[in-house]
A protein has these predicted regions:
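NAD(P)-dependent short-chain dehydrogenase/reductase
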Residues: 154-164, 187-244, 249-260, 285-290
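Non-catalytic terminal and boundary segments that flank Rossmann-like NAD(P)-dependent oxidoreductase
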Residues: 1-29, 89
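Active-site helix of classical SDR
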Residues: 177, 181
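C-terminal substrate-binding subdomain of Rossmann-fold SDR/epimerase-dehydratase oxidoreductases
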Residues: 2, 6, 228-346
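SDR active-site strand-loop-helix element
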Residues: 32, 62, 99-105, 142-148, ...
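N-terminal Rossmann NAD(P)H-binding glycine-rich loop of SDR-like oxidoreductase domains
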Residues: 28-48
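NAD(P)H-binding glycine-rich loop region in Rossmannoid oxidoreductase-like domains
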Residues: 82-121
Length: 346
């Protein structure tokens, strides 16, 4: 199928810099959450890698929405499993070597409106994959995509947050279904690694974005990008105090393979681009300055919108970088590519 130019550039960049071709040659890789941003771009990268290097990689993908999958991949050579991750998962057809578990709800309002489903998706889906990994000798590695939200509330700008730090999460707040769900499943992964020697690693991802993000996405970065494209004021529904780093899609995907192939089982690794740490408010002003000075920043705080508590999480990536990973895209380049992508699909 014909791919968007910006996405194709990202895919070709990934393939040109991918250092692990021999390690995954002729292997079968299961990817869950295949129609999400990370899952879909990751699969496209693997398919392109096959074309360029003739690696014989087999991709098995889990997704719920057939039409969305067809829109993303057309008739590409992917072996599909059509189901929700809370349903019993039958992998008996394949000898899976690697699992990259991307499936997760990502919308804040979903966590608030469907906390039970949020928890079940995290726990039941991951437990099935860990069970498979514990019982099949073909398994070489698994990465679980966790989140910086598993850290909870931390408000300290003075130090980089390392993987051994833990902040407070209120267990009787429905929005905690996501953050506590991620924390719980990290514990589950560590337990399987410890007791059953499952080679699973946890990736604590910061906010990841890039070409391929839906124009319907309601996350802050997407709303801000669309505002500067349309020449509209950037309207914030919080004070914008929360701060975190960011990571471009292909940089994050590259990190997942470093963890899959070089990470220590049972351990968690922060995934973020150094020197991108910024508050939401400062990000708004940065985008206005860099991309459309005719826009203004307007603050209209509202309650009960499902937003996370104020946190200031500057993640340390030394542990990941020690494996050899390094990012290629800085914050301005990330938004430049996202904005150009949005313009290309208008």
């Amino acid at each position: 199928m014909i791919e968007n130019l910006i996405i194709q550039q990202d895919i070709d960049f990934f393939v040109g810099h991918f250092p692990f071709v021999e390690q995954i040659k002729e292997k079968t890789i299961l990817v869950t959450g295949a129609t999400g941003l990370i899952g879909s771009v990751l699969i496209k990268c693997l398919l392109r890698l096959n074309q360029v290097t003739n690696s014989g990689i087999k991709v098995v993908a889990v997704a719920r929405n057939k039409q969305k999958a067809y829109d993303l991949f057309g008739n590409c050579e992917i072996q599909w499993i059509w189901q929700d991750m809370t349903e019993p998962l039958d992998l008996s057809t394949w000898d899976i070597h690697y699992i990259i578990h991307c499936a997760s709800p990502t919308a804040s309002q979903f966590y608030v409106n469907s906390p039970v489903e949020t928890i079940n998706t995290a726990f039941i889906g991951t437990r099935q994959l860990l069970e498979y990994a514990s019982q099949h000798l073909s398994m070489r590695g698994m990465v679980y995509l966790s989140s910086l939200e598993s850290y909870g509330t931390i408000n300290d700008n003075s130090v980089l947050v390392t993987e051994d730090v833990s902040g407070y999460i209120n267990p009787i707040d429905v929005r905690s279904s996501y953050s506590l769900g991620k924390r719980m499943v990290e514990c589950l992964c560590h337990a399987y690694a410890s007791e059953y020697h499952v080679p699973v690693v946890m990736a604590r991802l910061t906010q990841v974005f890039g070409a391929g993000v839906s124009r319907q996405n309601t996350k802050v970065f997407a709303q801000f990008a669309k505002s500067v494209i349309n020449g509209q004021d950037i309207v914030m529904h919080t004070s914008g105090e929360s701060a975190k780093p960011y990571c471009y899609t292909v940089d994050a995907i590259m990190a997942l393979f470093y963890l899959l192939l070089k990470g220590e089982p049972g351990k968690a690794y922060n995934v973020a681009t150094p020197n991108t740490y910024i508050s939401i408010c400062d990000l708004a002003y940065l985008l206005v300055e860099k991309f459309n000075k005719n826009c203004r920043v307007v603050i209209e705080a509202r309650d009960n919108m499902g937003y996370a508590p104020v946190t200031k999480l500057n993640l340390s990536t030394k542990k990941l970088e020690a494996l050899g990973w390094k990012p290629f895209f800085n914050l301005e380049e990330m938004f430049d590519r996202l904005i150009n992508y949005y313009k290309s699909i208008q």
